[in-house]
Amino acid sequence: MNAKKRPVSFYENDYDISEFDEIQVPQHIELAGYDKIHYINTMYPWEGHEYRRPAGTCNHIGEGMFSEASYNPTGSYVRFFDLEEALIGKRVILSFEGAEQAIYVWINGEFVGYAEDSFTVSEFDITPYVKETGNRLCVEVHKRSTAAFLEDQDFFRFFGLFRDVNLYGLPDIHVSDLWIRPKCALDGRQASMEIELKTTKGKTASYADARAEICLLDGHQMIAKEEVSVSESFRADLTISEPVQLWNCDDPKLYQVEIRIFDGQGDLIEIIPYQVGFRTICIEDGIIKLNGRRLIINGVNRHEWNAKSGRCISENDEIYDIECMKRNNINAVRTCHYPDRTTWYYRCDEAGIYVMAEVNLESHGSWQKMGAVEPSWNVPGSVELWQDVVLDRVKSNFEMFKNHTSVLFWSLGNESYAGEVLKEMNAYYKKRDPGRLVHYEGVFQNRDYEDNISDVESQMYAPPGRVREYLENEPKKPFILCEYMHDMGNSLGGV
């Protein structure tokens, strides 16, 4: 239903939904038989139909933009639920793993929040609104929003709740953030681990006498242990007395971190298991090195895709893709052009697949018009108005995947030109996580920023001669061909 004709008050507790249809979640609304399926490459889908320009780039941005647009399909979801017994009395979190493209959320008639960024988990604390029984969850999903200027990827344009929606409960003291930083010598003979933790607590809970027990195991063998007091923010340093085995694509050795939280009465209230590996990544003498050796990348770009269900994929789809990659000696993947399901990164850790973790950003239609480079109103570019919203996507990507050994590169996005905002994105990663490399191809289109954005020279579809020319003329950076053959449908014959 178009935004202007949507049932505006559907979230009210007494609103009659007897005329509503049923839909499976997760699922794209289009593949449930509503709206039209659109496939678009570089242009924004409204070009030629409605005039729109991003905020901060032109005096006139278009009448009504998306909320009053003549075409902006909207899905109104209603779900009734009771709390499971295990959630009663706990802080309750509502989690959307993927919602395209913008959502408004209500619980029992009360507005809970709004979220954009289709491919990043959005979570809401619904404790003040939820009851033990008879809850009414309402979600309004808009196909287009201001986020549309940043999500112009070359793919089918869907909308809806296309990943899982979950409820989970928090204990009285909960580890809300965890950063595990393994450190090792190139031969693995010396190793240590820094772990930073942040916690939240319930209104009646106390940190008094609460403690954390942190263990590092190799299989069933304990190789390091530390016990520390719990507070809102604390850390633990593990010293490892024996050599460790380094992680790589041929032998993706993982160790087990186990964190146990005890309250002031000595009761165990939370256990956090995590698998991590020891490895190093750096650039030395113009060469990318993993564990001190030259890194050889045999990689692919991977969209999340199932021929029947679109970007609504299953665990079996992920397992099939991993097995296919290993069969074909593929050792690296770029999450083009958005964060994947969180389970994918764990699979890459276990399988030894090097990951280039990409931010959900592509603004192709703002700087390339009908094939010509014309960046007069590109976003995010150097438009300060867009900086915070883009940095939010950068931070989300970092916080979600910072503990994954397989992530060697942070990628700033895809085909979004270059400017001061991309420069700030690069700076965020370099300051926050200097132990990884940053990738971005867009500076190829704007060389003014090649010294401030990306640790590597990245190009797309370059013929071998152009690659050779770059490498033979005192290259500033290592070269990565981040895309080399467009494989869509029954294609890839050019390889």
Question: What is the meaning of each model-derived region?
Answer:
Residues M1-G56, R136, E140, L217-G219:
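Accessory carbohydrate-binding/adhesion or oligomerization-edge regions at the termini
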Residues W106-V112, L217-G219, N291:
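Short strand-turn-strand beta-turns centered on an Asx-Gly dipeptide
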